[in-house]
Amino acid sequence: YFQGALRRLPHGVFSHCENLNQLDLPYNIEIINERAFEYCKSLEQITIPSTVRLIDTKAFKDCSRLERVNIASLNTYIRWDVFDGCIFKYKK
């Protein structure tokens, strides 16, 4: 749970949080910095609000169980290697 004026998730803030499996980010977050969720091996789902305008390098690197990423905005800039090491299944 975040409060106040936090607008950026710092570099590696949740890195190696092995018990984190689901996360709904609050609407005050604008930037997810590098490797913020790297190696969160249990993370399966994350909801990213429309206020997020940048998801930086390797933010979700090696989140091997990540199945669902809900991004509310089409204007969010996503670096090419954000999901490095993740394996997604395409669902119609």
What are these regions (language model features)?
Residues P10-V13, N33-A36, D56-A59, W80-V82:
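Consensus positions within tandem repeat domains that build extended binding/scaffold surfaces
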Residues Y1-R8, E18-I31, K41-L54, S64-Y77, ...:
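Structural signature of tandem-repeat unit edges
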